[in-house]
């Protein structure tokens, strides 16, 4: 059975065979669905401050 993963930045589903998995030196992994998410994470932007992420949508509804 193929596992689907979710993007650790924006929360979108990642299709099998796509996306990027980044492994830190301590062994922890981070999954990104696109280069857009990866670059925003590298720039240090918080997902709750970016309009197009799931975390931002949750804050707006509350």
UniProtKB/Swiss-Prot annotation:
Which residues of this UniProt protein bind Zn(2+)?
A: 7, 10, 33, 37
In terms of domain of life, where is this protein from? Archaea
Positions annotated as zinc finger (C4-type)? 7-37
Give the CC-aspect GO terms. ribonucleoprotein complex; ribosome
Gene3D superfamilies assigned = Ribosomal protein L24e (2.30.170.20)
* A Pfam family of this chain: Ribosomal_L24e
The cofactor named in the record is: Zn(2+)
Q: Name one GO biological process term.
A: translation
Which residue ranges traverse the bilayer? Answer: none
Q: Which GO terms describe its molecular function?
A: rRNA binding; structural constituent of ribosome; zinc ion binding
Q: Does the keyword Metal-binding apply?
A: yes
Alphabetically sorted, this entry's keywords are: Metal-binding, Ribonucleoprotein, Ribosomal protein, RNA-binding, rRNA-binding, Zinc, Zinc-finger
- Give the note describing cofactor binding and stoichiometry: Binds 1 zinc ion per subunit.
Q: Which InterPro entries match?
A: L24e/L24_sf, Ribosomal_eL24-rel_arc, Ribosomal_eL24-rel_N, Ribosomal_eL24_CS, TRASH_dom
Q: Please give the family membership noted in the entry.
A: Belongs to the eukaryotic ribosomal protein eL24 family.
Instruction: Tell me, in a sentence or two, what this protein's role is.
Output: Binds to the 23S rRNA.
Q: How does it assemble?
A: Part of the 50S ribosomal subunit. Forms a cluster with proteins L3 and L14.
Protein's name in the database: Large ribosomal subunit protein eL24
């Amino acid at each position: 059975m193929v596992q689907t993963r979710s993007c650790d930045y924006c929360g979108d589903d990642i299709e099998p065979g796509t996306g990027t998995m980044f492994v830190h030196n301590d062994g922890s992994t981070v999954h990104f669905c696109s280069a857009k998410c990866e670059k925003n994470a590298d720039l240090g932007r918080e997902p709750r401050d970016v309009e197009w992420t799931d975390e931002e949508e949750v804050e707006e509804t509350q």
